[in-house]
């Protein structure tokens, strides 16, 4: 994974307070690119927060601050919203403002149903993962405490320290796609609860949505990438400096790059003036936003590691790998920890040839060697068309998994069929309909097992896909 180019890691190279230091045009370009990439996840997350919450009522993945928005069913076959849609779990999303006091997130007893509530700060790493893996299915209360809060945690609550003012919960609750199961999940979603700590448990607490801002400063419908490009270099760095001031202070491990950024005048709480760097440098940085996005696009193509023909990406935790964090923000915002979910995918068969619906393919799990998970696994079929999308088909079937009552072979192995036309009624339980053109299957493995065989340590890998002559 490519690291930030030109970053001087020597601690103690702090810039003097105030004006930017004298640097050459080339030095300024290098530092500016580093700074832009460093802040990309923060600015992306903040733009996304505003777009998702600047509404007067909950509707799907949009809801006012302090309220859950719940998705009630899988996306339809013709969905073209967010690439690589999910047909295994229903989303529940909520943002909270911890600036005045902590908030409490509560969920009911989930029984043996798989669920996951990854929690993110504004920089986009997973800071906690309440759910089946970490806490089991019993009802629970989580105290979300913002920076500097020193109060007493009430009995029966689990504290989650949040290093930024705002916090996101992007929950997933398993659903099998039937109307009966949707109703059961929707009933659980209705019990996902948020309240300020001062109002927790008070029967007279009534949620009141914040007013909608009619002039938020940018489009509420454009993709965050486009919104950020529209900020320009000066606007972007000013937004970054403002966010780092109070809402999202940089982590201690970021001190080296913060010192570098100060050399061109990008500092928390201080206005950034591009012209102060001189006309030559200002001209050289004019196209920085597009250049940075191009850089992230190139890194997206090489971020995953290929194993046995399948591509894996280790995301969710980033440390000082600012490029990886920015790539995920740009093209896969946000992401789970591998311990919670792994999503290997492939675009080629065992001979390295691109997968296409013009051919027929099989994937066979040897007896006892299906994906090793504590949660569940499934394989989703996507057609490739400026994104990854469901494949409309007569069965309205977008995934194949054990919930299809897979039919084993005589030796106990399980063969799955990836093709455009039905392999026959007797094989349709194991069939994942493919488009006529290019496609990719993605395996979703929730709560993968840690002991071997495990996808986490590479002792288990998905079998390769075989073209059928």
Please report, for each region that a protein language model flagged, where it lies by residue.
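Gram-negative bacterial Sec-dependent N-terminal signal peptides
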Residues: 1-22
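A compositional/structural signature for long, glycine/proline-rich flexible linkers
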Residues: 20-469
